[in-house]
Amino acid sequence: MSSFDLKQRAVEWFSNLGIPTQIATFVWICVPIVVLILGITLGVLVLVWLERKISAAVQQRIGPEYAGPLGTIQALADGLKLILKEDIIPSRADKWLFALGPAIVVIPVLLSFLVIPFNHQLIVADISIGMFFWIAVSSVAPVGLLVAGYGSNNKYAFLGGLRAAAQSISYEIPLALCVLSVVLMSNSLSTIEIVEQQSRFGILGWNIWRQPVGFIAFVISALAECERLPFDLPEAEEELVAGYQTEYSGIKFGLFYVASYLNLFASSLFVTILYLGGWSPNISFEQVFNWEQGEQLFAVLDGLIAFAITLSKAYLFLFASILTRWTLPRVRMDQLLDLGWKFLLPVALGNLLLTASFELALL
């Protein structure tokens, strides 16, 4: 790992511009957050475009074509349309709960990106309990769905909110147990240390080889948490019109879709971090060329390559999830709950017990 301290160099650069050190430190805190928000926005736009193109290819269609080159700004046009549409509030709805629901859904998903590392230094909040933080904030989002369904004063919306709550509880527990298995093997809750632990033996050190059962259970639980087909029961159009978002319009309606894609994007990144080695195997230019000069250039190149590797693995998982949407049929609600409680929970619990036994045997 390079000794290049990005924070220190950034503060020094701001100080050289005549900015006091305290203000420069505050600016450094704000810059990664702004960059993260812009990066998340761009990543979601790319994800929406990829899903439309891949879905069109599966169905032997062309997909978005006229909005920009190859339809690349179609998602931006759709977002602008939703922003400009009228925000209608039903007369008998609870106005406070109706407005609060989308915010409760989006904010926890945005917070989960704070602990996602793209490199040793490309992370907003390097806390020692990163995985616990993600599990904690992700469990808040279903409350927003239930609030949105209840506040709409609509039977279809309320049923969709109840389904979302039941589905989240059913799959949050297996998801957390799979994370605990990885944490036991890594001996840390830090996302960076989990990646570093996998990088010791290159590709063979990835947790997907040591936790194959946990990987499968985690992927299924993550897809169910994101309410992706075949687990989109809370918003099944044929049964519930649009589920908990039936009465929503305009920007509030768009926030639910943004939260869905953000959750899918975050889940794919956590799959990469937990099981696919994160940014490893990364190439350190400083070690390869052994040059004493150009330390900053090496650090920038290392960071860019690590960022590209992490995103490549994440979008590979996204590609698989998009194909799954057009491959598998939607399950019934009883089948969904049976899969979570009668299959995934025992499998994830057994995997955790085996992992704990193995780790104790190595002491």
From Swiss-Prot:
It is found in: Plastid, Chloroplast thylakoid membrane. GO terms for molecular function: NADH dehydrogenase activity; oxidoreductase activity, acting on NAD(P)H, quinone or similar compound as acceptor; quinone binding. It catalyses: a plastoquinone + NADH + (n+1) H(+)(in) = a plastoquinol + NAD(+) + n H(+)(out); a plastoquinone + NADPH + (n+1) H(+)(in) = a plastoquinol + NADP(+) + n H(+)(out). It is a multi-pass membrane protein. Its main location: plastid. Its EC number is 7.1.1.-. The chain crosses the membrane at residues 26-46, 96-116, 127-147, 175-195, 203-223, 253-273, 303-323, 343-363. One of its GO terms (biological process) is aerobic respiration. One of its GO terms (cellular component) is chloroplast thylakoid membrane. It is an enzyme of class 7 (translocase). InterPro entries: NADH_UbQ_OxRdtase_su1/FPO (IPR001694), NADH_UbQ_OxRdtase_su1_CS (IPR018086). Keywords: Chloroplast, Membrane, NAD, NADP, Plastid, Plastoquinone, Quinone, Thylakoid, Translocase, Transmembrane, Transmembrane helix. The keyword Cell membrane does not apply. NDH shuttles electrons from NAD(P)H:plastoquinone, via FMN and iron-sulfur (Fe-S) centers, to quinones in the photosynthetic chain and possibly in a chloroplast respiratory chain. The immediate electron acceptor for the enzyme in this species is believed to be plastoquinone. Couples the redox reaction to proton translocation, and thus conserves the redox energy in a proton gradient. Belongs to the complex I subunit 1 family. PANTHER family: NADH DEHYDROGENASE SUBUNIT 1 (PTHR11432), NADH-UBIQUINONE OXIDOREDUCTASE CHAIN 1 (PTHR11432:SF3). HAMAP family: NDH1_NuoH (MF_01350). NDH is composed of at least 16 different subunits, 5 of which are encoded in the nucleus. This is NAD(P)H-quinone oxidoreductase subunit 1, chloroplastic. It comes from Zygnema circumcarinatum.
